[in-house]
Amino acid sequence: MPNNNEEVLNIIFKISDNLEYEVDEDSIVTILEKQDHKIQKFFRKIKFRIPEYKKITLDEYSSYVFLQIDGKKTVKAIGENLEAKYGDKVNPLYERLLLFLNHIDVNCHYIEKTNS
């Protein structure tokens, strides 16, 4: 667990290896979550129409942040890029950015930390 703000801003994330996603022409990311629970497979076999993937479309800001995550950029660098592109619309910047990154790391497992 990082001890201070500087350590938090130096965290580097990468997209999880097993995550599937699509990017459209407007740079909007759609996460594809495979639905392969045994109950879902069973109902598909008896011809229920259950999609194999759940599609989650991110908004403009989330998509921009997600596409910045490359295993090299720090949280601080991603924040600076976000502020350069969107200006005051993203303030309070790091509070919102860290909340989003924590959510897609801890709750969704879309990304993972590459450094401690």
What residue ranges belong to the model's regions?
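Hydrophobic packing positions characteristic
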Residues: M1-K38
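Long, charge-rich, low-complexity alpha-helical segments
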Residues: P2-I15, K47-S116
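Alpha-helical membrane-targeting segments
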Residues: I31, Q35-K55
